[in-house]
C-alpha cells in the first residue's frame, strides 16, 4: 500500500514538474516571438520610413517622400540581412535597395560600401564597386517609384552599406 501511494505521489510530482516546464517554455517562446515581432516591426518601419508620432493625438504618420523637389539620400533606403551560408561556410548577406519615394524616380544612386567584395559574383548591372567606398546601383540608371534592387553577396563579414548620393527626376 505504501509503495502504491509513493508511486502515485512521485507520478503527481513528475506531472506537475512537466507542466511547469512546459508552461515556462511557452512563456519564454512567447517573449522571444514577441520581441522578434517588435524587431521585425522596427525594421519594417525603417524600411518604409514610418516613424512613431508621440503627439497628443498619437498614431503613426508617413514621412513625406513624395515630391521630386525634395530629393535627398533619404528617398533611398538600404536594407541588409543575413542569408544562408555558402556550402564552404562563408556567410552570405541579402541586400535590398529601395526607392521609397512614391512619386519620383531616382538615378545615379551611389552607396558608400568600403572595399566591397564578394566571394560570389554580384551582377554588376545591379550593384558594382567603382572605387573605394563608392558602389553604383543599376549602373547609375533609373529606379522608379517604390522600385527595389536586390542581390546577395558572400564575405566573412557584412559591409556597412549606406546611401551616399542620389539624383531625382
UniProtKB/Swiss-Prot annotation:
Transmembrane segments: none
Keywords, ordered alphabetically: Signal
GO biological process per UniProt: cell fate determination
Keyword Protein transport annotated: no
Disulfide-bonded cysteines: none
The keyword Signal is annotated on this UniProt entry: yes
Domain of life according to the entry: Eukaryota
Signal sequence coordinates: 1-25
InterPro entries to which the protein is assigned, alphabetical: TPD1 (IPR040361)
Tissues expressing this chain: Expressed in roots, and at low levels in anthers during meiosis.
Protein function: May play a role during anther development.
The name this protein goes by in its record: TPD1 protein homolog 1B
Taxonomic source organism: Oryza sativa subsp. japonica
Annotated gene: TDL1B
